[in-house]
Curated annotation (Swiss-Prot):
SUPFAM superfamilies: MetI-like. Changing residue 189 to T: In strain: ATCC 6633 / PCI 219. Residues 22-202 form the ABC transmembrane type-1 domain. Keywords: Amino-acid transport, Cell membrane, Membrane, Transmembrane, Transmembrane helix, Transport. The gene is opuBD. It comes from the Bacteria. The chain crosses the membrane at residues 27-47, 52-72, 73-93, 148-168, 182-202. Belongs to the binding-protein-dependent transport system permease family. CysTW subfamily. This is Choline transport system permease protein OpuBD. CDD domains: TM_PBP2. Coiled coil: none annotated.
Amino acid sequence: MNVLEQLMTYYAQNGSYVMDEFGRHFLMSAYGVLFAAVVGVPAGILIAHFRRLSAWVFAVTNVIQTIPALAMLAVLMLVMGLGANTVILSLFLYSLLPIIRNTYTGIISIEHAYLESGKAMGMTKFQVLRMVELPLALSVIMAGLRTALVIAIGITAIGTFVGAGGLGDMIVRGSNATNGTAIILAGAIPTAVMAVGADLLMAWLERALSPVKKKRTGAKHVQSAA
């Protein structure tokens, strides 16, 4: 059998296993990015308002980003042991930089006139943040989440080395087999599909949440009503 036939046979015989590992892979990636968003978005907002802190925060997150993923997993494994939690923590650390950076960029790029208009209407600082800054910066923040999620999906593939499972299991198993090209592809193809699908979904959300698009949509509704 050629590689394509071997691949189809593998999927036919191990379809439920592949789907289980696909779900496990995605959940680890999503949890890592979600936890990073819970920390990274407030951190980005904070350093956007207290810019003296930005150099320190970016210095730390840039250093984290330079550590090879396998080395990070090895160090965290010594502390947390084997399993998915080690991978999720490493994804959390790697996702901080794109999320914090985009949140910071989105907030500081808002025109000062919008902020002054909010203050002139009697808004508190929290109301300006909630009703002016976050809506205008949301598409940029989503771009950071998009980058973080795609990176996380790739890093999760090597989580198999710390016993986390995921699609990387098939890639490693195929690498160790005598004629394992089909097994490698059985793990690599779903990983690529997941990354591309996540990127397209997040790109759509980014466009949907863009304030420019909302403004144009609102203008069309006004014109049609007129």
